[in-house]
Amino acid sequence: MLEYYLSKIVKKAHMRAIRNSEIDKTAGVCAGTQIIDSSVGRYTDIGYDCVIVNTIMGNYCSLGADIRIGGAAHPVHHVSTSTVFLKEKDHIKKKFAMHSFQQFERTIIGHDVWIGDGAFIKSGVKIGTGAVVGMGAVVTKDIAPYEIWAGNPAHKIKDRFDK
């Protein structure tokens, strides 16, 4: 029982990191979550240990824990996928070439979207208003409003409401 309470204290002490982002004052962001170059709408609730990069998120969204949204892509059409051949700034000091490549595509999440624990959302994906993404889903395609998706890779399960 003591271990349970100690784990809760450690979890709460884990800090969150918000960089270059706008979080509405009514939104909730749990410990361990990183939000980078993003905006989060009103009354949106984000669970523990999420990573959200280059994302616009609407109002009234609910996100579980351990979710990954956005992130860098790599140039699979180039000779190498390494970032040492790209001109974008990153943590690598010496670059070998200066090819242009957009590493971070903007991800759009509509209003009232529910994303379950452990989901992965690829950068550049658009998730429509009222959509539901199941836990552990790997979303690589756009999701229309009010659709329910799950699986790896994620696929449409059904519409949220009858038409």
Regions inferred by a protein language model and the residue ranges of each:
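Conserved beta-strand-loop-alpha-helix hinge in the C-terminal portion
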Residues: Y146-E147, P153-K163
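Flexible, glycine/small-residue-enriched loop-and-beta-strand segment within the central core
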Residues: L6, V10-A13, I35-V40, D45-V125, ...
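Extended, small-residue-rich solenoid/repeat segments and analogous flexible loops
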Residues: M1-Q34, V84
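Glycine/proline-rich loop-helix segments at beta-alpha junctions forming the active-site rim
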Residues: T129
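Conserved G/P- and acidic residue-centered "switch" motifs that form tight phosphate/ATP-binding loops
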Residues: V133, G151
